[in-house]
Amino acid sequence: MNIPAELKFSKSHEWVRLEGDEAVIGITEFAQEQLGDLTFIELPAAGDTLTAGEEMGSVESVKAASELYAPVSGEVTEVNLHLEDAPEAVNESPYDKGWMLKVKVSAVAGSLLSAEEYAALIESEAH
């Protein structure tokens, strides 16, 4: 399973790529594998404010529905609109074409995990 070392991860399986005061957010490869083929993604709009740890949207798949939780606080600056018509991009490329949001960060959740810590988390959840 691909767990990019340069990313941070939440316990609810969102990833964050911090780029200065901006963050790119998506869901992990593990999350999309557990959900199966995504059929619908609900995301906040540009200009909306996120609070770390609070709900920021949801995803639906052929198997399940799941809430998405903000790994950072801040203002949404961009939403990947391509996902409205092609939610399967998250299944095909969760860390690249399947990114969900860009956020101007005001605070980062203190509980974000390194790639190594996240690998241990999913290993424990698998058993």
UniProtKB/Swiss-Prot annotation:
Transmembrane listed as a keyword: no
This protein's record includes keyword Endoplasmic reticulum: no
One Pfam family from the record: GCV_H
GO cellular component: cytosol; glycine cleavage complex
A Gene Ontology biological process term: glycine decarboxylation via glycine cleavage system
Keyword terms, alphabetized: Lipoyl
Domain Lipoyl-binding intervals: 22-104
Cofactor remark from the record: Binds 1 lipoyl cofactor covalently.
Residues the record lists as N6-lipoyllysine modifications: K63
CDD domains per record: GCS_H (cd06848)
Annotated disulfide bonds: none
Named cofactor requirement(s): (R)-lipoate
Subunit-level organization: The glycine cleavage system is composed of four proteins: P, T, L and H.
Protein name: Glycine cleavage system H protein
Organism phylogeny: Bacteria, Pseudomonadati, Thermodesulfobacteriota, Desulfovibrionia, Desulfovibrionales
Gene encoding the protein: gcvH
